[in-house]
Amino acid sequence: FRKAERVIDFFVNYCITENGWVYSLYDTEKGAPFASFGDASAPRLHYMYYEKCKGNYLRTMTEPMLDLLEAYLWYRKKGVKKEKWLESVIRFANFLLEKQNADGSWCRAYSMTGEPVYMNDREDYTTEENDRGRKASTIIPVMFLCALANCLGEEKYLQSAKKAGNYALGHEVRWELYQGGTMDNPNVVDKEASQYMMAGLYHLYQMTKSPEYLEGALCAAKQFVTWNYIWNAPMRKGNILFSRGFCTKG
């Protein structure tokens, strides 16, 4: 438990900024965190790159903060209150509320000052297609906000989650178009997007008992399982997985 506490305390002390924006990467050699994109001096960890500003993705900020909330709740059950952890969780949640668009969406990435980053717009796409790509990760914070609303009993976090869920129902579930779940590209359909949609809407259903959220979760789930059991993702020639005849089914 002590070792786990030290790891979590390190994350809280060094990776969460005053405005709620979150680092998800840390360079142990330099002794400093670094941005997921836009930091020329940092290790390049992904083929997608953006040089105009430093920032992080909505997904890679939300995932560790949900873990932090779960850790807080686990320790609380053991009779140990980690108030600094909860304060950090709330700071990020308030960052989300502040950055949520009027239509209920969030952008896929944000600069360190909290400005939305549009890194993959395409000239051959319509305005609607580019806008949908910019907001393709909207469902991702919903589980986190539902969990926090349940923890604190504060309606504002549930209302924010519902706004995001309603946006997702109208712009993604309605068209059965689940894209932008990975960091690769906001306009690529992927299994993570349908998985997050399923999980986020199901959490909303559990919190509200509104049937439209359960129906949306089921719709996303039907596409998600095809990635696990039917769809055999192609492998690029020259890749070691291709040479071994690797299959993604099952």
Specify the residue positions occupied by each region the protein language model found:
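Glycan-recognition and catalytic cores of secretory/periplasmic carbohydrate-active enzymes
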Residues: 1-250
